[in-house]
Amino acid sequence: MEKNPITLLILNGKSAGNDELREAIGELRKDGYTLHVRVTWEYGDAKRYVEEAIQLKADNVIAAGGDGTVNEVAAALAVQPEAVRPCLGIVPLGTANDFATSCQIPMEMHNALTLAIKGRATAIDIAKVNDGHYFINMATGGFATRITTETPAKMKAALGSASYVLHALFRMDMLQAERCEIHGPDFHWSGDTLVIAVGNGRQAGGGQQLCPEALINDGLLELSVLSATELLPNMLQAWFTGSENQNMISATLPWLEISAPDDMTFNLDGEPLTAKRFRIEVLPAAIHCRLPPQCSLLE
């Protein structure tokens, strides 16, 4: 008889009172599954719990939270030796849940938890930025970064992903271009940009398809740059309706480097990183993740 897997669930503290998740955990425990639960309260907790999972010889580590929680857990898994690395599972509990939504992970707690424990384990890529920073979904820079990092927590809680668009409309005074240079294999671009997106996944900011062709197991990243040739009208048209825009520059690359005369801030799935230079590279098949058969981000 095959043993039931050992699972450690890392729960974002903001969702610690979720009754639906508590009920789903109880049901799976009654079915014989070993489920340890740990709650994060500050940055660094997830890394410590991943290390604990390895000591427990856990088969799965579940990130229960939003995109930031998923990324923090994935980054902690990526630096562990492959021989002892647990498989990542995802239970979406955040505001936007962009990565989980793109992967078509169920929003219903019992179904998501069951998938995270028993679903198909698939090797997926993650991206490394400079030394020691990672993202599983997307890095965004420019106006989009300011919006996603400055949208008030109360607005996000009340309105969900629509809060990002609403806050963007409130803060058009922040709309200014940033000069930078981007290069990678057989690619070079320089100029003024409003938004830069580097995607392992496809969407960010509450459902905006910034990198619509990205895949999470192809060993490549999708780059999308909105140049500042024309400001507000074309930006809104391209980024909020998904229509084609001549000021959009796209490329598919295994790595790229971005340099700027002034500090730029990128949002790495919720983690802000400020620098004048960024090297972003894909780490192919860096971790395994339990995903549904219909996941559209797989080759």
From Swiss-Prot:
Recorded hits in InterPro entries, A to Z, give: ATP-NAD_kinase_N, Diacylglycerol/lipid_kinase, Diacylglycerol_kinase_cat_dom, Lip_kinase_YegS, Lipid_Phosphate_FormReg, NAD/diacylglycerol_kinase_sf, YegS/DAGK_C
Major site of localization recorded for this protein: cytoplasm
Which residue ranges does the record assign to the DAGKc domain?
Answer: 2-133
Which residues are recorded as binding ATP? T40, G66, D67, G68, T69, V70, N71, E72, T95
Gene Ontology biological process terms, A to Z: phospholipid biosynthetic process
List, separated by semicolons, the cofactors it needs: Mg(2+); Ca(2+)
Active site residues according to the UniProt entry:
E271
**Family to which the UniProt record says this protein belongs:** Belongs to the diacylglycerol/lipid kinase family. YegS lipid kinase subfamily.
Name the UniProt record assigns to this protein: Probable lipid kinase YegS-like
Which species? Pectobacterium atrosepticum (strain SCRI 1043 / ATCC BAA-672)
